[in-house]
Structures are given as structure tokens and as C-alpha cells.
């Protein structure tokens, strides 16, 4: 009854959903008939180091992410971005599996002899086309929001990305028209965005003025004001709404990137209050996206939340050394350079958003950008530098031999105070010149990374070697990171791209039970996340894997769960969703009640087999109700280990029962670490007298009576009875209720899932089993997957030798 009411209410909510209206009136194509297929929502917080996330959570700036972790819904992993630790390289590896596909955010494209900036559509398209020739994009068939690349998404599904922000792209794909329709359909959201923009503007203008009076460059301060308002608020709200529409449509993969924190952290530093201010809004946006994904009726979505890299608090060569790094290089090379009064050094030039319009002003601006990308006459005679961060690439007009490179690198470190210089010799070996001397890469580089986690050192060293061997890497590569602190070559206070401690440690939040590559236990890198995503979407298998959040303790986790025919509170029949509940909790033994087998109401599926297949578990089905040719109905037992069936039988009923439905029980024995565990799963009747008769039978000589005192026993299921009833007292007289076994534990109700008020699902255990923990997970998934909540117990048991003794 409760499920029908909730399903009815959800139906009418969908009818009046603005997301559904947007799908209909924007001419978007929903994906139908795929409700049981997986969907992946990737949410990226650009530039947020794991350390900064933990600090923000501790200060209460991200309450939703805190809730996800504290309630056990998500486990946190370190996300290592590779080298360079910048978004274009990370997303190239994430989408296409190409490591160090580009050597930096800005570098010299040796083919065209022009400076590439991985924010301009022409460069993004060029390099992404090369990646696409090597592998299929992770987002194929899906959508990409506010990223560098499309990731394989179609042009019409690529929004505010580096590859599709040109006006022509937006016009051809109909996005300009859709913006106007969007304003009409999402008018409340538009009003809210406008209000947020005005509020942020009121806060930002005084702060920008204060920055100017403190000596900051006026154009940078007001450029930051625009970034804060347009990217931190406007773009965040637009991609959030767009992402909600896309998961409502049922696209297989959706990737949304929030840029606001990264932009502000570059300006003021990654730990600044200024940058952390943006995280509260991002947290709320993630909450909205998470809710939309779990409400979607067209896909079974997983939501993975990550940051592509962190940032380091830095000092700047551009602001502390007149002439910047270009002047330092020229002095060390003893090469006089003519200063162009009309042009600042490249390392001191800002990055401007590309012009979108076709006006004459925009055309002139594009022409200036094209000219700026070309090497100057002076650069073609001496050297050029691409250094938009803590990694700088230096390209010589005239080749240098190994001796010359080494001598220059030593001068840059000793005389120019550059923390480190990498170069590749003629034998294809990479060397790292630093204050202490020189080190071969990757062999000796781990020793220079002693402050990093041990698991990361060798990986960073290998990636630095790969970076230097990129075809577009500099003849020498400057590193701003060293033992004496972090420096950047651009005018910024927060930076990333190198091997610093925090820039190499982002974060990844995934539900427990998520399958990750087996070698990603210490950290997850972009190619690992790609492999996990492709496996989850069914595109490619994981050759070997581990479960995120899996326990290592030697104990048993038991779950009992009334699955309600796998029919959720939204009216959707989904065995896959029930499997997700089990997977999230990493249960070892699972007793499921109300499982269909071959019934027309559930697509004639074998639900127990489908759930077991999704988990890779053993399964036994116990039918209790036969519907002739229309299938069977009963309960099932799933296990990580082989199942030995001892007995399957019908339980006695009461002749005068007002609902005379057949009831049965399944008794199985499972060997765990050499110990035989007896488990009986059942679903008792609805009348009080019937339940008393059935409980006496289960505890009698034909069932568990003879072994309760001598062997480990678990009796679990939906008993349709509450504590204090006669049959409960019968069970408690010989076995222990796991929810009453531990002092201080407050028993939790399991029915109904939306508003639990009854404790009718139970796990009883014999004295051989110690209850370490009993809990009822209540989250967005368990509230909707069935009309009951699952009950779990962590049980410890003595060894086989102790039992024998």
C-alpha cells in the first residue's frame, strides 16, 4: 500500500517536473527502455586537493559530502592525476586512456610552430582528434559539461567545453535557440541565478577594490571579479540544471565539471577563505545532481565525485622577479633579448576566455589571439617559453647538445633560483637537475619525493619521464616545485601541473562496493577511473578488481532484505538496483524475501539469478507461491561462498488465517574460513497465530532445535512481527536478536522504507556468533529500492579449532 501511494505521488511529480518539460520543449531525445541499464554521473570539482576537501568538510562548508561519508554511503580515495597535473592531461587520460597526452596547459605545438593553449577550441579539437584515433571516448552517447574535451559526446551534447564554446559550434547545434527556450521553461531557476549573481557581485566588487588598494594589478582584480561571478555562479548553476536534465533523459554517461573553486584558488591560494567560499554552492549543486540521478526512471545511475588534481600555495617568479622567468633564462644563457614594449613576457600574460560572437570587435580580438600564439621574431632567433603555471617548457631556436643543456640547467638552478630542471639526453634518458645535484629519472627520482606518500613516489617518477618524452615537451622543462617550497612561473598564488605534494593528491568519492582496478588500492589515477567506468557501463571488463570500501576484517556480514519483488517506491522494477544495495554494503550472506521468478509483473525475469550475476555470488531460490504458468514467488539466499542446501520446506499454517498464503523456509550450510555456518531464511505469515506456529516449527526438532547449542546458527528474514510479541519471545529464548545484542545500540525500524515505524525484519544468532555491529542503512538508494529497509549485522565467530575444542 505504501509503495503504491509513493509511486502514485512520484508519477505526478514527474508529470510536473521542469526537467521533463525541458526534454519535451527543447526537442531533446529521452532514452527509453533502458531503466535497468547502468548510467554514470561524473561530478568533478576542478582543482580541489584532498587536503582542502577535508578542511572544508571539517569547517562545515560541504555538509552534503560530509553526510555522504559519515553515513557510510561513500568511501574516499586519493586521486592521483599523473603528470602534468593539469586538466587537459587528466581528461585526456580519463576519456581516452592517453597518459601525458599534452605536456602542459600551454606549450609549443612543434608541428605548427605556434603556442598552444588548451582553452582554445582549435587546439582542443586538434589534440582530441588524435586521442579519438587511439581509443573510444568514455562519454560516447553521453554529455560533457564545462570540460576541456567532449570525451566522445556528440557536438550537440557538449556544452561550455573547450572544444565547443565557439559561436559557430553553438549556432550549428541549436544551443543559442535552446537558451531562450530554457529561460522560459526554467524561469524560477533563472530568477534564482540572477539573484545569486547580484549577491555575488555586491560581495565581489568591494573585495576587488580592496585588492587594488593593496597593490594588486587592477585588470587581474576585475578579471577575477568576472570569473567569480560568471564562472563561480552563472556557469555553476547552468551546468547543474543541464546535468539534471541529462540524467532525467537517461544518457549513459554525464560528466559535469565545476570550475569556480579552481579559478579563485589560482587568484588567492587553495586554502584561502576567498576560494573556500565557493565550495558551499558547489556542495549544494552536487546535492541537486545526486538527487536528480537517483530519481531518474530511465537509467540506474551511479554518482562518482572527484577532483582532477589539487593546487599548491605558491610564490610567483612573474611578480617577484622583474622580467619573469624569460629574463632569468636569457641571463643564464647570456643571450641579450630586445624588449618589446607592446608585449609582456608570455609567463605574465593572462588567459582570456575566447570570444563567442561574430562582431567586428570579436574578430579583431581573435586576430590578436592568433598573433599572440605565433612565435615572435625574437623567439625564432633565441628561445621561447610556455610557462602558464609551475611547469615551464623552454624551446631553443638552435639545438643544444647534452653538455650545453646540463650546463644551462645547472645555471638556472644555482644562479636563477629555479627549483628544478628536467632534460632529455640523446640516449633518451631524463635527468633532474636540482640544488643537491642531478638525479636520473625515473630510477632515482623517488628519493626526491620523500615527503610524498610512498605509494606515489615511483608513479610520479615514471610520469615525469613520460612527460619529458612527449613530442611537444620543451627542450628543457622547468619545475617550480622543490624542497624549499612551491613556485609558479605565472602571476598566481595557487598553481598546479607539477609533482607537488597537494597538487598530486585529489580525491575520489565512490559508493562502497564500486569495482576499481586491482592495482588502485593506494590511489586511483585517471586511467583507473576510465577502466572502472567502462566496466560499469558494460563497455569492457575489468581483468581484476577490488571493491571500494571492502572490509579486511575476518568476520561475516549478513543482510536480510525484503526486496518487494524488486519493485521500488517509484514503481520501477529493478533487480539491478537491489544488487546495488547489496554491493554498497559489501554483504557476504544475503537473505532476500519477496523475489519473483518468471512472473509477468516483473518482465518474467529470474530476479534472484540476475542479482547474483550482478554481484558474482552463489544463489539458491526457495519458491513459496506457485502461480501456474505465470511464474513463482518466494525468497532467495545469496553467498560469496558455495551454498550447501540442507532443507527447503513449507512451514505449517493456521487454518483460520485471514491471508492463507503458503510460507516456507530455506536452511543452508556455508563454510567460511573452515567453519560451517548454518543459516535459515524465511518469511512468516500475517496472522499472529500463524506466526507462533511457524516460529515453533523453526525452533523445533525438524529444523534448528537439535543444533542451536552445538553449531553456529543464523535465523533471519521478514518475520512480520515486532519485539514483545509471542513469536519474538520464542526466538529470543534460544537465540539473540542482533539489534538487541549490543549495549547502547538503539534498534532501528525497517518498514516502511520512506518512513520506517515498524521493526519486523530480524536477524537472530546463536551464542557461537558475536554481534560486532547491527545497522539499517537509510539513504537515497535504500529508501527507493523497496518498501523495506535492509538489516545488516557484522558477526564474528571462533575458528574451526576453537569450535572443535
Enumerate the predicted regions with their spans.
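Beta-strand elements within well-structured catalytic alpha/beta cores of enzymes
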Residues: 35-54, 68, 253-259, 275, ...
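A long, amphipathic alpha-helix that forms part
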Residues: 15, 233-234, 238, 246, ...
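Active-site regions of metal-assisted phosphoester/phosphodiester hydrolases
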Residues: 545-589, 613-614, 618-805
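His/Asp/Glu-rich, glycine-adjacent segments
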Residues: 3, 13, 93-269, 390-393, ...
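Alpha-helical membrane-targeting segments
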Residues: 1-30, 168-235, 345-373, 377, ...
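Metal-dependent active-site segment of extracytoplasmic phospho-/sulfohydrolases and closely related
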Residues: 285-322, 431-433, 477-479, 707-730
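Active-site neighborhoods of enzymes that stabilize oxyanions during catalysis
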Residues: 119-132, 141, 145-152, 348-532
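Active-site nucleophile/metal-coordination loop of metallo-enzymes that catalyze phosphate/sulfate
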Residues: 10-39, 49-174, 185, 337-374, ...
